[in-house]
Amino acid sequence: IEPKVGKVITGLGVGEHLAYWGYPADKLIELDWQENATLADGFMVTALPARHFSGRGLKRNQSLWSSFMLTTPSKNVYVGGDSGYATFYADIAKRFNTIDLAILENGQYSDNWADIHTLPSQLPQTIKTLNPKQVVTVHNSKFVLANHAWDEPLEKIAESAKNNDINLKTPMIGEIFYLDDPNQTFKAWWR
């Protein structure tokens, strides 16, 4: 995939792994929280906080976990990354004012992991705080790390969306999603 990639923007310390896998240094941009990278045609990526950890075993926390805001000439797209619930969402909402799409973690959670994975009971508050025009949830329906049913994350957020005026989009993996069509609907494919 590397030949098809223009730039890789990531948190501090992740670039060394990509370089090991053959990515040239001139394609790698590492950012600390609150730093941004300006790209061509008015695009900018800002690294923002997330609440997680990095690494496994004895080599933990040697790289930075992040969320990102992609700012285009006409849209703000927030990619929440792998994160537990935290108060920094209010700071992000204040800084960016309008968020057109929030892509948020929703799955592979446990009460024991609440600091690093958003719980279903916390997700509506995250969405309310960020106040995005549209929401897509990720980190679900692909692999199992937790003890909940594979479809539980989607069931819970779909129910919550109905009760909390959330413009939730649930495209099937690979299905086309049109950011400029807030009325686009998707079937509940997981049922």
Task: Map each language-model feature to its residues.
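Alpha-helix C-terminal capping segments
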Residues: 1-4, 70-71, 161
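Active-site HxH/HxHxD metal-binding segment of metal-dependent hydrolases
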Residues: 1-38, 46-56
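Structured loop/turn residues at beta-strand edges in well-structured enzyme cores
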Residues: 3, 26, 43, 63, ...
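Cap/insert and terminal regions of metallo-dependent hydrolase folds
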Residues: 7-19, 86-173
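Residue-level signal for beta-strand positions within conserved beta-sheet cores that form or flank
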Residues: 24, 41, 164-166
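Short low-complexity, flexible loop/linker segments enriched in glycine and/or proline
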Residues: 24-26, 44, 150-152, 184-186
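Core dinuclear metal-dependent hydrolase active-site scaffold
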Residues: 31-97, 173-191
